[in-house]
């Protein structure tokens, strides 16, 4: 019983760390876009309430992405269902940006934001894929060393 509880706790903690990482990453990307838009308009201060909305929105969407959409940005490959998951998340961000009036409901800027978020999701997908290849190669190297009896860590 103790092991099963400990394993469940580890799994939950691991999931929460992944969610935290992604929510912060996507929130930061949204804030960068928002701040660039402000700078282009000659505004040199950001609305803190908007920044809070961006963080909360990122957390909610990442939870949806993680638990309901199969975590599409960490897939091995981008099939139709994963692409639809990414598109769903991007559309949620775009709708929320319009709803919360982050970009003054400017349709051109909102469309740019949609394209920007698609590119962010694709970059995160590629980065995760590259990291998996690196991790796999490292584990294979460690396994080879272990089999030879040459482990040096």
Where are these regions (language model features)?
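N-terminal signal-anchor transmembrane alpha-helix
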Residues: 1-41
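C-terminal halves and exits of single transmembrane alpha-helices
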Residues: 84-113, 117-130
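Alpha-helical transmembrane segments of integral membrane proteins
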Residues: 17, 21-29, 49-53, 80-88, ...
